[in-house]
């Protein structure tokens, strides 16, 4: 099979660099060009030392981009939308890792991000969560990567709402997130002496990924997200507090997950009765495209605690985007992604 050429815009950041790492091992992809204004002329390993010896590519300025089969855009929010015409002319297949085209509802976008530069294009991209939108992705030329916190939340809650397991009451979500979720650009909040050893509530209300969660969950339930920053480099642990319908049992919860995720290559249900590793832990999915999902039901009250662990840069960003590309191209879904995490 002839390889498809792929270029990455914004490849010096964490999201673009992670897509590059995965793409370099993909048997059907040839990485053609990678861009960075700041590091133009520098070899890739100058910014991503883990890729030393894996590629001889050097960063180029975006103005020197040539046409390719696939263009991955890992730009700050708003940039791709403002320069859409220029970038869309370079490749028939576009994969956007920013928030620019994740939402279809212009009012939701306005509430969380402000005015959209290209509201006429909202709804033209397919949301890159294969577990939810596999059929739509099969014919998608424009793909919008999901937010990392939204990915963790959606994967944990979607089967329960689809099966009618939950009461129509507000769902409260807490997200323990890592430092890399803030991106490669340094800030006072990410400065090591300020961040190391700290567990900081940084977004108690109004988290932007709430919009994606609400728009993509069945019935558009009332969901409230609180984000807590930890000093881990990678990983997200999502816990959701909700209530099951009267008379519903643990068996019903199991059934909802098994029906939704039967045969899913990157979903693992983690709920053991004994041992140290009874529930999902971001440590064991670090660097992988797996999502570990678990739960615990308080039978006498009906309170259900749902847990999801993912790597924010892989399953939360570049990994699910590459998985979506595999679906789009008709390739085996696990290509470039089929590897386990580390232990210990």
From Swiss-Prot:
Keyword Amino-acid biosynthesis: yes
Reported function: Catalyzes the NADPH-dependent reduction of [LysW]-aminoadipate 6-phosphate to yield [LysW]-aminoadipate 6-semialdehyde.
Compartments where located: Cytoplasm
GO BP terms: L-arginine biosynthetic process; lysine biosynthetic process via aminoadipic acid
Pathway assigned to this chain's UniProt record: Amino-acid biosynthesis; L-lysine biosynthesis via AAA pathway; L-lysine from L-alpha-aminoadipate (Thermus route): step 3/5
Name of this chain's protein: [LysW]-L-2-aminoadipate 6-phosphate reductase
GO cellular component terms listed in the entry, alphabetical order: cytoplasm
Gene field: lysY
Record annotation: effect of changing residue 258 to A: Slight decrease in kcat and 17-fold increase in Km for [LysW]-aminoadipate 6-semialdehyde
Organism listed in the record: Thermus thermophilus (strain ATCC BAA-163 / DSM 7039 / HB27)
Effect after changing residue 271 to A: 5-fold decrease in kcat and 70-fold increase in Km for [LysW]-aminoadipate 6-semialdehyde
Keyword set, alphabetical order: Amino-acid biosynthesis, Cytoplasm, Lysine biosynthesis, NADP, Oxidoreductase
Binding site for NADP(+): 12-15, 36-38, 75, 180, 184, 312
Zinc recorded as keyword: no
Any single Pfam family the record assigns to this protein: Semialdhyde_dh
Main location: cytoplasm
UniProt effect for mutating residue 102 to A: Strong decrease in activity
Subunit structure: Homotetramer. Interacts with LysW. May form a ternary complex with LysW and LysZ.
Catalyzed reaction equations: [amino-group carrier protein]-C-terminal-N-(1-carboxy-5-oxopentan-1-yl)-L-glutamine + phosphate + NADP(+) = [amino-group carrier protein]-C-terminal-N-(1-carboxy-5-phosphooxy-5-oxopentan-1-yl)-L-glutamine + NADPH + H(+)
EC number: 1.2.1.103
Active site: 148
């Amino acid at each position: 099979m002839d390889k498809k050429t792929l270029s990455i815009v914004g490849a010096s950041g964490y999201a673009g660099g992670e897509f590059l790492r995965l793409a370099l091992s993909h048997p059907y992809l040839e990485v053609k060009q990678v861009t960075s204004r700041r590091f133009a002329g520098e070899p890739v390993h100058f910014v991503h030392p883990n890729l030393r010896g894996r590629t001889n590519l050097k960063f180029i300025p975006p103005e020197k981009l040539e046409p390719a089969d696939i263009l991955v855009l890992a730009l700050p929010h708003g940039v791709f939308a403002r320069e859409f015409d220029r970038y869309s002319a370079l490749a028939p297949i576009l994969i956007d890792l920013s928030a620019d085209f994740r939402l279809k509802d212009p009012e939701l976008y306005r509430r969380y991000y402000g005015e959209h530069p290209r509201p006429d294009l909202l709804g033209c991209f397919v949301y890159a969560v294969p577990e939810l939108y596999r059929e739509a992705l099969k014919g998608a030329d424009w793909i919008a990567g999901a937010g990392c916190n939204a990915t963790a939340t959606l994967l944990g809650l979607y089967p329960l709402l689809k099966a009618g397991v939950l009461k129509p009451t507000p769902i409260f979500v807490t997200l323990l997130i890592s430092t890399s979720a803030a991106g490669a650009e340094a800030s006072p909040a990410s400065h090591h002496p300020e961040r190391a050893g700290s567990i900081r509530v940084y977004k108690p209300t109004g988290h932007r990924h709430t919009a994606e969660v609400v728009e993509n969950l069945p019935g558009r339930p009332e969901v409230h997200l609180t984000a807590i920053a930890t000093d881990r480099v990678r990983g997200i642990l999502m816990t959701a507090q909700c209530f099951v319908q009267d008379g519903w049992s643990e068996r019903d919860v199991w059934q909802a997950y098994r029906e939704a995720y039967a045969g899913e290559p990157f979903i693992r249900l983690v709920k053991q009765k004994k041992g140290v590793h009874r529930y999902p832990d971001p440590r064991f999915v670090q660097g992988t495209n797996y999502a570990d999902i678990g739960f615990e039901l308080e039978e006498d009250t009906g309170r259900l605690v749902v847990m999801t662990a993912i790597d924010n840069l892989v399953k939360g960003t570049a990994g699910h985007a590459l998985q979506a590309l595999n679906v789009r191209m008709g390739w085996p879904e696990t290509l470039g992604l089929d590897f386990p995490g580390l232990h210990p």
